[in-house]
């Protein structure tokens, strides 16, 4: 059997961070906790301020569902996660959120990549978008930018935005 102590410590640290964040945010206004699995179904209000408490992937995933609302990325465990998209610690939430609420914190705009199929379907990504077959086969595709296009054949293409190029 394996040793699960580290997983238990990680979970305990995360649960403590959630509790502290809820306390801090609750003193500043209404709080609605949305789990990652419910994000695709949640409708954010135009005036909502969103706090993502987790790893970088949670920030990138959450951004896909926002339409101009500010998002504050919070690192629940700085000793464990580098958090390129998590500039704040839970202990910094109070002053950071007060700045955000009064509009005193600069916002960083995020560009998204969008892929459109000839079937009319589209897919957006905040960091990286893989375009290709699920299997190891080769695909034929056309890459276009403005009025210029090129035909290609390969196993696929990875398109990275500014967030996707963080490493």
Feature locations, PLM:
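Short His-Asn-centered micro-motif
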Residues: 52-54, 74, 161
């Amino acid at each position: 059997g394996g040793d699960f102590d580290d997983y238990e410590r990680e979970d305990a640290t995360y649960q403590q961070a959630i509790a502290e964040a809820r306390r801090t945010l609750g003193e500043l206004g209404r709080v609605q906790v949305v789990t990652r699995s419910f994000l695709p179904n949640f409708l954010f209000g135009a005036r909502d301020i969103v706090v993502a408490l987790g790893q970088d992937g949670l920030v990138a995933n959450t951004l896909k569902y926002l339409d101009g609302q500010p998002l504050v990325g919070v690192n629940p465990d700085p000793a464990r996660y580098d958090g390129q998209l998590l500039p704040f610690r839970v202990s910094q939430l109070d002053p950071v959120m007060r700045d955000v609420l009064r509009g005193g914190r600069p916002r960083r705009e995020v560009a998204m990549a969008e892929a459109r199929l000839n079937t009319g379907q589209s897919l957006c990504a905040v960091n990286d978008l893989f375009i290709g077959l699920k299997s190891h086969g080769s695909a034929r595709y056309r890459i276009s930018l403005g009025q210029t296009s090129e035909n290609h054949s390969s196993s696929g293409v990875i398109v990275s935005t500014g967030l996707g190029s963080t490493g």
